[in-house]
Amino acid sequence: MLGLIVFSLLFGFFLRTERSPSGQSLRNIIDGIYQVVMKITMLVIRFTPLGVFALIAATVTRTGMDAIEPLAWFFLTVLVALGLHAFVFMPILIALATKRSPLRHIQAMIPALLTAFSSASSAATLPLTMECVQKRSGVSTRTSSFVLPLGATVNMDGTALYECVAAMFIAQAYGLDLSLTTQFMIVITALLTSIGVASIPAASLVAITVILGAIGLPAEAIGLILVTDRVLDMCRTAVNVWGDSVVTVVLARSEGEEQVLSLPVSEMETVTTTAGHADRDATASEQS
């Protein structure tokens, strides 16, 4: 399975560099297949609540309420891990790399983070993320328009973390002995699959089935965590968006953008709005 993922990444990379008509035709075919598969996936997701109810009811009937305690520990473990990554590691990275207060960037990103949490979709949040980073954090359009769309696809911090914890939890539930080599393979597979995960709700479940197959577990084992997935999906999406914005701010500062996080959010919005009006006026004058 790991070899298939690596091959897919290389195939996609070299297909993107192929500029011939046949290369474009192949890209169109693959894109069409992707669109169809996503529609099928969304149809299946619509019936997920019914399936989750049946799975949980059957499990509780067989084992009693004892099955709920491990699931609660799994839920708590993921929340703590996401919290440490978002509120400890990321703020330290901002402070060290930008020499600015992390609280200022957190305040700037609140609208985007709330939208990401409620929608559970990085793609749906992307326009608001770009607006917050540009107008409230002071990052240039040139930097944010390059980093954020790319990050929404390949920089899935929360997703990769969740996939690792979920795969290990399911493996332990099935009584699988996780050697150090197996754990390392889970981490690598989670990192690679998180790169290609679609920015839509519940897309991580597809990636987890890939990881389960890589360690010899059946795909239906994912039913063990479906009951908690919606809430955790909202949390990890917010972490994904937060991670993208942090990388953008750090990169902007490394490129010499001194205005990044240099002013309070209210003042930054005024400055960026005024600058935007000035740029449009200058462009209009040149055209006239």
Outline where the language-model segments fall.
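Juxtamembrane helix-boundary/capping and inter-helix hinge elements in multi-pass membrane proteins
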Residues: 18-24, 32, 63, 98-102, ...
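Transmembrane alpha-helical segments of multi-pass membrane transport proteins and ion-pumping complexes
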Residues: 4-8, 13, 17, 47-50, ...
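Transmembrane alpha-helical segments and their short flanking loops
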Residues: 164-288
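Membrane-interfacial loop-to-helix junctions in multi-pass transporters
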Residues: 1-2, 42-45, 81, 97-105, ...
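Small-residue-enriched core segments of transmembrane alpha-helices in multipass membrane transport
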Residues: 33-34, 72-89, 108-114, 184-197, ...
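Loop-to-transmembrane-helix entry motif
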Residues: 33-47, 71-79, 109, 113, ...
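Signature of multi-pass transmembrane helix bundles
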Residues: 1-104, 288
